[in-house]
Swiss-Prot record:
Zn(2+) 4 binds at residues 185, 188, 203, 206. This is E3 ubiquitin-protein ligase RNF144A. Zn(2+) 5 binds at residues 211, 214, 226, 232. It is a single-pass membrane protein. Belongs to the RBR family. RNF144 subfamily. Residues 16-236 are annotated as: TRIAD supradomain.
Length: 292
């Protein structure tokens, strides 16, 4: 008995084999899938695993062609995805797509109550100032800008650690802002929840790296020096040994590039005159008149 992926050699010899750009294997055409938008072709098994992995991890954008050098930068259509994944994975894909649509829709917003998460409609779309939004599911009234409870006559706070549920007051939450389980990305203002682990956070929406406790940017802090001083000292959530190992790796990478450049510099200096001479000879040969 033969599987759908492997067939006898005498059968394979009759069909032309197509190469998959993901696994670099060669398979018959019926075991390959072509993306309609860009016409890039991959083996069905690889493409299926690629799509399932993106959906399970929580895709941030449309599922693009796996080929990084795709000339058309194609994307998989919904009907193509539905043909290759299970029903429960497809259901999760549609849910993620809907959440992203609401996130970027100026007419809609999510109810900030953690037990509700209904979609609310903004009354006045053209209004530039924060407006009152009332959730029809839980009757919570909140600000359209900062998603906190409605605060008439007051400006929006810079950061909101958590949104209170209906019937609760601030006295029920004695935790400091740094200990809040839900915060907003300081760059794109998307809500992020942290259960435990590392305090170096990266927003899935805008890829901004920041400190969970003080919300300071860590985009350029490759060595995580931020956690060596100040109020966030020793709050990274990793052992000192793992931090030292991380820094050693980063320094090693930069040192390796520097050493490579240093070693290659003499060769580049020696090769430059030869390259210039060759170019001069070629240009001189082009200018010489043809013999008569």
């Amino acid at each position: 008995m033969t599987t759908a992926r492997y067939r006898p050699t005498w059968d394979l010899a009759l069909d032309p084999l197509v190469s998959c750009k993901l696994c670099l294997g060669e398979y018959p055409a019926e075991q390959m899938t072509t993306i309609a938008q860009c016409q890039c072709i991959f083996c069905t098994l690889c493409l299926k695993q690629y799509v399932e992995l993106l959906i399970k991890e929580g895709l941030e954008t449309a599922i693009s062609c796996p080929d990084a050098a795709c000339p058309k930068q194609g994307h998989l259509q919904e009907n193509e995805i539905e043909c290759m994944v299970a029903a429960e994975i497809m259901q999760r894909y549609k849910k993620l797509q809907f959440e992203r649509e609401v996130l970027f829709d100026p007419c809609r917003t999510w109810c900030p109550a953690s037990t509700c998460q209904a979609v609310c409609q903004l009354q006045d779309i053209g209004l530039q100032t924060p407006q009152l939004v009332q959730c029809k599911a839980c009757d919570m009234e909140f600000c359209s800008a900062c998603k906190a409870r409605w605060h008439p006559g007051q400006g929006c706070p810079e950061t909101m650690p958590i949104t209170f549920l209906p019937g609760e007051t601030s006295s029920a939450f004695k935790m400091e802002e740094g200990d809040a389980p839900i915060k907003r990305c300081p760059k794109c203002r998307v809500y992020i929840e942290r259960d435990e682990g590392c305090a170096q956070m990266m927003c899935k929406n805008c890829k901004h790296a920041f400190c969970w406790y003080c919300l300071e940017s860590l985009d350029d802090d490759f060595l995580l020096i931020h956690y060596d001083k100040g109020p966030c000292r020793n709050k990274l959530g990793h052992s000192r040994a793992s931090v030292i190992w991380h820094r050693t790796q980063v320094v090693g990478i930069f040192a390796g590039f520097g050493l490579l450049l240093l070693v290659a510099s003499p060769f580049l200096l020696l090769a430059t005159p030869f390259v210039l001479c060759c170019k001069c000879k070629c240009s001189k040969g082009d200018d010489d008149p043809l013999p008569t």
